[in-house]
Amino acid sequence: MAERNEQILTPSQLNALARDLLEGSFPLVWVEAELSSVTRPSSGHLYFTLKDARAQIRCAMFKPKSTWLKFQPREGLRVLARGRLTLYEARGDYQLVLDHMEEAGEGALRRAFDALRARLAAEGLFDAERKQSLPAHVQRLAVITSPSGAAVRDVLSVLARRFPLLEVDLLPSLVQGDSAAAQITSLLQRADASGRYDVILITRGGGSLEDLWAFNDERLARAIAAAQTPVVSAVGHETDFSLSDFVADVRAPTPSVAAELLVPDQRELVARVRRAQARMTQLQQHALGNAMQRADRLALRLRAHSPQARLQLLHRRQEEAGRQLGARMTQVLERLQARVQRGHAQVQSHNPQRHLAGLQQRLRALHPQAAMQRRLQHDQLQLRSIARSLEAVNPLATVARGYAIVTRPADGSVVRSAAEVAAGERLRAQLADGSIEVRVEPGER
């Protein structure tokens, strides 16, 4: 066999090179054509052919992309498809793997939608900073939608089930057709200007891009952005997006979800109220217990400072003072008696008669009678003088003459001056034959 300088390839190698060339040379492409040979096996994938009058290309749309289609693919339907070129190596088939497909009439609308969305986004109409928050408790709601569509039934059903107390005004409008956008815009502006509503809901059910086109109107988008009342947009299904969704304060994927966002579930509210009541009862019981404890402490303090308790305390103090006074008086009397006894002993020791007897004995010892007589007279005079001096200082003598010794019962001190006592003060007066208690009366000193 002759030697060859060219590289020799196997079919699989050649198909792999061709696939790499196709996938690397062509970006994401859009194709408008007619559907043919449509099949959907049990795997959920979608296989068909796109053709025009002169050519055709095999196409595949794998699950789950095929499940999001908004229409039913059928023979002869004209579509706008987007995908990437590739090569199925096992058969060498050149094909287009799609990730999006819509009916062909929507192509121009899609391009217009993308252009307007980009322009409004550049103006900042979609910015989160300009969007308003929904009120915590919605009391009045305006619903702009078709009065006969499925959307209004879904919304009203959810609202009635979750929160029947909500006041809802249905503002009927066309939601499809040439005049729908202007009518929705007018109703929105009037509802916002009235100041009556807490939230305005714009909604309708699903449909094609053309069916939903009223909600991509530029005037409606700008009216939503200018509204002072928070606006919720719930247009179509979860996969549908309109300009009203982007510019609204809140976008809900479906009308039912919008209703759930706007009101709480009354069952959850009841549960929350019950929890709050239980908590309030617990707090009340705790507060009542604390108040009762404080009341008990105050009652104890009041009893401790009540007049009766005060009188009892004063009575105990009076009894104690009486005991102390009695003890003091006893001590004072004992001291006075001791002083009297000492004075009596001193008087007895200086008794003139005893002294006179001694002198007489001494006189008898003296022989000159005259000298003895003079000496005796002199001594008698001295004795009388001493006796008078002793009698002058004898307390018993003073008491015996009708005087009294006045002392304070509390400490036994002797009162020497009227200036030392006060009106009403109780004193003790010691007399010759006993003692009496006296009280100082007001008067001149």
From Swiss-Prot:
Domain of life: Bacteria
GO cellular component: cytoplasm; exodeoxyribonuclease VII complex
Top-tier EC class: hydrolase
Catalytic reaction list: Exonucleolytic cleavage in either 5'- to 3'- or 3'- to 5'-direction to yield nucleoside 5'-phosphates
InterPro entries in the record: Exonuc_VII_L, Exonuc_VII_lsu_C, OB-fold_nuc-bd_dom
GO process annotations (BP): DNA catabolic process
The keyword RNA-binding belongs to this UniProt entry's keyword annotation: no
Keyword tags: Cytoplasm, Exonuclease, Hydrolase, Nuclease
GO MF entry, a single one: nucleic acid binding
EC number, as in UniProt: 3.1.11.6
Cytoplasm among keywords: yes
Subcellular location: Cytoplasm
Assembly: Heterooligomer composed of large and small subunits.
Job of this protein: Bidirectionally degrades single-stranded DNA into large acid-insoluble oligonucleotides, which are then degraded further into small acid-soluble oligonucleotides.
Record-stated family: Belongs to the XseA family.
UniProt protein name: Exodeoxyribonuclease 7 large subunit
Native species: Xanthomonas oryzae pv. oryzae (strain KACC10331 / KXO85)
Gene expressing this chain: xseA
